């Protein structure tokens, strides 16, 4: 009877940690325990570790930890790539060893044995394409084409030279300090791919996210059908109601069915929960990057716009204060976060994305990059 509550507690703690890690820096959580958990996970735990190592082992050990940090965070390395391969390989191996014996089953066709292999193979192919394809490196040879392809908007992108590459930096490009190169239509540096995500490989990255979301969802659903088939074939509900006199209702059957499943099929339950959580996280990333593609925006540009809007708001507030105007504070952070109303000063701050050409053309630009079109080649010859 205590097992379901244990699962609820485990799920609640997991959800709190995930939400704190991903969303703890949102303004809505400022000053709350969610922000404090986020700070501990992203900075605090590491700083405490450094202090502990320094106190226990001295400067040499501390410098060693800092060297490992530099290798892992400031230079290209395959650590997360290896971790990804290990996660996929170990998870699929466990599923084959523990769950393929139930395929075919009451609700699951034997075809899924082979579909799973194809699904994992396609995921691995997308991983390789994203990891090892050129993200759109800007060089002295092609910089003129990129300068023509993306105009400067004069707000978040202004004409300037890359201080490292010593070439003009096109609009939407950024110099990646990890890869040490300028990348056109820079989105972000992805440690999982050990590669930048830019103009030429955003399509592979988005396809990778969507496909892995579908794989995890598919795996969780199939495992659920396996468990449902086992309940049906073993007549668990019938035995509980007829032989043990359990009330034939959800509230009466659930604790006993859950106990039986955890006792007999705990591996399948853990795998299904794991895949469902990963699918939920990937679904969020898919939605976010789909939104970026539809609006022809990148992660880097999103941060730039946030910084610009915050700067403009600060300027407006200073002007209002200088003019003796008093702005009423919102009643709460939650209302401020979800409210659609804006103050007079806020309405003057407009995000003017000149690269947004409509959803269809935006998606075409992602999946058929400008640098792979004939017009781009003609600019080179000109």
From Swiss-Prot:
Reactions mediated catalytically:
L-cysteinyl-[protein] + hexadecanoyl-CoA = S-hexadecanoyl-L-cysteinyl-[protein] + CoA
Post-translational modification, as annotated: Autopalmitoylated.
Q: Which residues cross the membrane?
A: 3-23, 76-96, 114-134, 206-226, 236-256, 269-289
| Family designation | Belongs to the DHHC palmitoyltransferase family.
- In which broad location class does this protein mainly occur, judging by the first location in its UniProt entry? membrane
Quick check: keyword Membrane in the entry? yes
User: What Enzyme Commission number does this protein have?
Assistant: 2.3.1.225
Q: Cite the domain annotation text.
A: The DHHC domain is required for palmitoyltransferase activity.
> What is the active site of this protein?
190
Q: Read off the PANTHER family from this record.
A: PROTEIN S-ACYLTRANSFERASE 17-RELATED (PTHR22883:SF286), ZINC FINGER DHHC DOMAIN CONTAINING PROTEIN (PTHR22883)
The DHHC domain covers which part of the protein?
160-210
**Pfam hit, one:** DHHC
InterPro entries under this entry? Answer: Palmitoyltrfase_DHHC, PFA4/ZDH16/20/ERF2-like
Q: Which GO terms describe its biological process?
A: positive regulation of response to oxidative stress; positive regulation of response to salt stress; protein targeting to membrane
Q: Report the protein name in the record.
A: Protein S-acyltransferase DHHC9
Keyword ATP-binding found: no
The membrane topology term of the UniProt record is: Multi-pass membrane protein
Q: What does this protein do?
A: Palmitoyltransferase involved in the positive regulation of salt and oxidative stress tolerance. Palmitoyltoylates the salt tolerance receptor-like kinase STRK1.
Give UniProt keywords alphabetically.
Acyltransferase, Cell membrane, Lipoprotein, Membrane, Palmitate, Transferase, Transmembrane, Transmembrane helix
Q: Which GO terms describe its cellular component?
A: endomembrane system; endoplasmic reticulum; Golgi apparatus; plasma membrane
